Curated annotation (Swiss-Prot):
Pathway, per record: Cofactor biosynthesis; molybdopterin biosynthesis
Species per Swiss-Prot/TrEMBL record: Drosophila melanogaster
InterPro entries: Aminotrans_V_dom, MoCF_Sase_C, MoCo_sulfurase, MOCOS_middle, PyrdxlP-dep_Trfase, PyrdxlP-dep_Trfase_major, PyrdxlP-dep_Trfase_small, Pyrv_Knase-like_insert_dom_sf
Catalytic activity: Mo-molybdopterin + L-cysteine + AH2 = thio-Mo-molybdopterin + L-alanine + A + H2O
Enzyme Commission (EC) number: 2.8.1.9
Pfam families assigned: Aminotran_5, MOSC, MOSC_N
Assigned protein family: Belongs to the class-V pyridoxal-phosphate-dependent aminotransferase family. MOCOS subfamily.
Residue ranges of domain MOSC in the record: 635-781
Function comment: Sulfurates the molybdenum cofactor. Sulfation of molybdenum is essential for xanthine dehydrogenase (XDH) and aldehyde oxidase (ADO) enzymes in which molybdenum cofactor is liganded by 1 oxygen and 1 sulfur atom in active form.
Active site residues according to the UniProt entry: 413
Protein name, per record: Molybdenum cofactor sulfurase
Amino acid sequence: MTSYRPEFSASEQSQIDAEFSRLASNKSVYLDHAGTTLYAESQVTAAAEQLQRNVICNPHTCRLTGDFVDQVRFKILEFFNTTAEDYHVIFTANATAALSLVAENFDFGSSGEFHFCQENHTSVLGMRERVRENGIYMLRENEISGGKHKANGKVHEVSGKTGNSLLTFSAQCNFSGYKIPLEVIEQIQIDGLAKPGKELWSSLGEKKKNMHNDYYICLDAASFVATSPLDLQKYRPDYVCLSFYKIFGYPTGVGALLVSRRGAEVFQKRRFFGGGTINYAYPHAMDYQLRETFHQRYEDGTLPFLSIVGLLEGFRTLERLVPRTDEFSTMERISRHVFGLAKYLEDQLRQLHHPNGEPLVKLYNKVGYQDKSRQGGIVAFNVRTESGSFVGFGEIACVAALHGILLRTGCFCNIGACQYYLGLDEDALDAIYKRAGRICGDYFDLIDGQPTGAVRVSFGYMTTIQDVDKLLQMLRSSYLATKPLQRIQFIEEQAEQLPPLLKERVQLLRPKLLQMAIYPVKSCAAFKIELPGSWPLTDQGLKYDREWMIVDMNGMALTQKRCTELCLIRPVIKVDQLELQFGENSTISVPLSLDDQAADTAKCVSKVCRQPVEGLDCGDRVAQWLSENLGMEGLRLLRQSGQRNSSKDQQKLSLVNQAQFLLLNKSSVRSLQFEEPLDETVDRFRANIIIDTGSAFEELTYKALSIGGIQFQVEGPCQRCDMICINQRTGERSPETLTTISRLQKGRMRFGIYITRIPQDTKELEPKEQHMTCGDVVLVE
């Protein structure tokens, strides 16, 4: 187990704590430094005092302001260990604006192409829309760091080649904290890319594709430089994009684009120009001249000069609170501090297990926490239940907020990283964003039990080991010592304390009715009702459920135990008819109305579970259709006509075996971990009501429940037989379903629960017909 070694001395830590006393005053633990770090109290005080002491006005008016801005410009270069001889500093609104500036002004030439890494911030993806020049390619991280060429010389100057290709990647992944080795910068500048990546778009002919162009590197350093040193003498990307609030917490609204001398040679001013970027522009003629100074050509309009001046106190505060030592610089010390906290947290999380041995969390990282040059101060994970199913990150956000812990959940504007770490293929992404309707920034956290994002914890220089321990204690107390319903009740009781977005998430914590399945013909396939559909209830169960059955020539009910092909008969309930389908071309219909059917129909008697049932024969035509398709002579279709009561409590029943409804928890099905699609496994259990809860098999503890306000009594668990071994899509048998349930239930064959509707307490002569709707909230008593 990792022991934590503090980077800061006791006196240094005491001074830092004093600067952030507002955290203790607000009983807050702040763990989203990858979103923004926090500003020190003396930092904003000093910035305000500077504004009070000086007359700082438009830099076009006041030389003092210009001097301040130049001072900041030189301080930025010093911070990254470079000089104005090697890099220009262009002020922007933020890192996103810097990326946009590169996309707008980079000269691709006639054959240059744009390459970007899959695990990039959304802003890098946005560059694609500005660079539709020749070709756009997506690289996976291993195609950048794994496809290196041996460096064989110095970085060449701009050559006579016809194209310039641009590769953009993040120095540190803001999802996981993984750092791409920066040695690849020089190697790619010299030798180009070994592989171009996946082609997304191209206007080039085959002969011009992937030509040996000159390669330039745009480094998205926003996440990296917040807690890590970037030495631009050692690594020389052509463009560096960053936001200062990530480093200092204050001010916001100012970032920078650093452009190397090499990068400047292929940086062409776009058509637009603003105030301050030109020597002159005639209104009467299409004539203008750009400024000679490189950075002035690209800083359109008045700079955010007050914010820029405020950066000086950011640099001073950082250097004062985390002073350089003989061995390490300020940023190296911060990097060591946040990495140590991340390593400690990751190790502690790995130690957390449920009583049955299941790990509490699923961690997402590439190289572990052994080397701070490859991993930053970020830990990404999802929480799992005792059965192995995932807890939605929205619930974690709610629980954390109620414990005063501020962290981040979702995909963090990095869908590519989400896709990689969660193992989502392209179809899964479509299922999340196009079919299920998730959008960036929402709390739509689980689809079919699989996470759509993660929980991210990230550290800054003011984060303490006590902060990390409070997070660990929250996870232990909430997810190792309590049950899902207890957590939900806790969140609901405290919901008014949550911010608005999380209040909306509280409404999603309760399980909901996902699907209803009506089986009009006993032992045949289901007619399914899904979101947002509703269905009426009768005093026997779901309307039309198990109202028909097929009998053999001896009048005995035919089930899948004798004829698995029954599952291939698919019913469709229409306005006035029940249509039966077998295969693609064979269909037949019978009337839904008993009045239409009863006129010329013979009455018959059969048995269900040893109980006699009365039925109406549906005629020769459908009988012949059944016999031909199932390959059995003498089959008849009967419809229940008389009342049938259970032997136990006289509840009214259709042709079901035991109770009015069979409820299934999709989370329990998921725990079986079969290789077949989840919906196919759900179909095996032939349930009427399908819900999805926070943990598997919790339905076995229910005594009563309500769905959309309709009350149900739990009759008990469903004891399973080998019927569940039949694949309801194909009719094929496979024994592993039964053996897996037996193993999970320690020899018992229970899966799903029987429930019965509690009659309405009403004195109306004709009570209103009740409906259930997919999406109805399930409340457990």
